[in-house]
Amino acid sequence: MYRALWLLARSRRLVRPPASALASAPGLSGAAVPSFWPPNAARMASQNSFRIEYDTFGELKVPNDKYYGAQTVRSTMNFKIGGVTERMPTPVIKAFGILKRAAAEVNQDYGLDPKIANAIMKAADEVAEGKLNDHFPLVVWQTGSGTQTNMNVNEVISNRAIEMLGGELGSKIPVHPNDHVNKSQSSNDTFPTAMHIAAAIEVHEVLLPGLQKLHDALDAKSKEFAQIIKIGRTHTQDAVPLTLGQEFSGYVQQVKYAVTRIKAAMPRIYELAAGGTAVGTGLNTRIGFAEKVAAKVAALTGLPFVTAPNKFEALAAHDALVELSGAMNTTACSLMKIANDIRFLGSGPRSGLGELILPENEPGSSIMPGKVNPTQCEAMTMVAAQVMGNHVAVTVGGSNGHFELNVFKPMMIKNVLHSARLLGDASVSFTENCVVGIQANTERINKLMNESLMLVTALNPHIGYDKAAKIAKTAHKNGSTLKETAIELGYLTAEQFDEWVKPKDMLGPK
């Protein structure tokens, strides 16, 4: 039987279905029907675990329990790269569901059969809700335009809509993946649209909330530590005093700026390429289609999406994603500094700086009993390093848009989404398992501050830089205190030293 089917496909003898079959096809409602209909191979193969579907290259076996079709299967054959861990990110698939629903709704306004449009919208909603995730097997490493993933989405929505209308999977009747689901669209404008939708949602649902949580926790610690005076450090060496609260206020400001930078990049992310079709001209769309689709997407997501003012830029360049990735890269730099400072200040417990007492979350060593490590700081710094690497990849991808189309799209969005998720999740983890539980080791802080030679800086206005420097160097050489040395050198009295060297008076301008 299957040999006969293969020969039939090879000879391309496609038979026209009888008029009665066309008339009785479920849900046609006057919709355009292809001139030629593939042979009834799907029914013939249904007794097994697969059905036969066709693309322009010929027939392929498609698993009966999957909604995708021939083009998706062909992509799995051609791009066996990386395995399941390299699949197209779920946020992109969900974003496609949102886009396809919006497009179907607008296409209905322009004359698409309401029965077909409604079925597409229902199927697209299921995609957007994640109900059909198992039907998207394709990896990131495919065509750089994301065409295979766009067709994966089209096929899944088409077959699910056909099923809803009582039709036969793979028949493309009454809902065709290209003619109906992809109507007025191209992979070249749908994929960048899905990229922006996915990135915006991830930023708003994961990244910004995580950073805000971290900001608030650091701000609370800054206020809690406002009266604790400690020695400062520059070049990792002793410097003049400040409060632990002041030190933490620097971290607060860094995270505040991170949020500001990310928000500043979002207006370009809100611009959608939909309506540009193949090269940005809008071929095969209707006037107003782009604006209406953007408005529908905005309504569905609650985010201020608009149509891109220049579709040529929206298809050929992805500077908006590079900009957002750059903001996240800067955020990673900030978080690397913050996490490193906190773990170094908490080093010890007896042989390090030991100014901070960090929460103990789990055993730290398989050989050293009782050892506890700053694991949340380590996780955060690894995340920061990964985000920096992701930005390099995004930068390379963004710089390689050639002529009318950038063909690094899947790789770019994979890394942008990865960075947003990692930074958001790590911020929450770092906050809940480290920052909120940080305590100040005031005994250690006071000891280190009182032993610091840099308190001598307070004497500059009274005895001059050169004498103050001699006090510090002599005290360091002899192992004596600043006060003892200053008196021994005859530069000032004990009373003068006590009056002039007061750490609490060294915290700001007079």
From Swiss-Prot:
Q: What is its EC number?
A: 4.2.1.2
On this chain, the residues bearing Phosphoserine are S366
The active-site annotation reads: H235 (proton donor/acceptor), S365
Q: Name one GO cellular component term.
A: nucleus
Q: Which residues carry the post-translational modification N6-succinyllysine, per the record?
A: K61, K66, K80, K115, K122, K223, K292, K467, K473
GO MF, one annotated term: fumarate hydratase activity
Q: Which of the residues bear the PTM N6-acetyllysine?
A: K61, K66, K80, K94, K115, K122, K213, K223, K256, K292, K502
InterPro entries for this protein: Fum_hydII, Fumarase/histidase_N, Fumarase_C_C, Fumarate_lyase_CS, Fumarate_lyase_fam, Fumarate_lyase_N, L-Aspartase-like
What family does the entry list? Belongs to the class-II fumarase/aspartase family. Fumarase subfamily.
Subunit-structure text: Homotetramer. Interacts with H2AZ1.
Q: What name does this protein carry?
A: Fumarate hydratase, mitochondrial
Q: Which organism is it from?
A: Macaca fascicularis
Q: What is the lineage of its organism?
A: Eukaryota, Metazoa, Chordata, Craniata, Vertebrata
